[in-house]
Amino acid sequence: MTSDTLSPAVQRALADPALTHEERANLELVLRFRSVPFADRDKYTVDGFRPSRIGMATLAALNPDPGLRYDGRSIPDRTDRILDVIVHGDRVWATWLIEGTHLGHVYGIPPTGRAVSVLEVGQWRIENGLIAEAWFFVDELALIHQLGAWDGLASAPRGADDPGVNQ
């Protein structure tokens, strides 16, 4: 990992003299974890690791077919630009922008070829040099809007108990 390939936010965090040795190691672990394909991330996590996702999880619930979920084929040219990062003790928080081209299924939304730019926030808890827990929130409404799927959702029939009906 070279600092010239890192975002200014990560460079600032790594250069922070107030970081402890543990905090610097935790940040470097998260950066290594994020730098490899999804299939190769297990070596950075505890056994049985399962991240908590909010945002994409809602889209997954709409279409539970495992063949139509999000994977490396969904946005194959995906890049993540870290906008901000905070490290404190055993926690690392980051905000990043996912950018790329929608060329594979995203939770049932067929490939559109459209460019996407979506904000995501993540938090990782480190234990004994491995990621023990992680939580992520992605702006799924921005994603479905950019993929052209918003019109179908916005015009879907609503029940009388839907709070948006009377607004």
Located regions from the model:
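C-terminal and inter-domain tail/linker signature
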Residues: M1-Q167
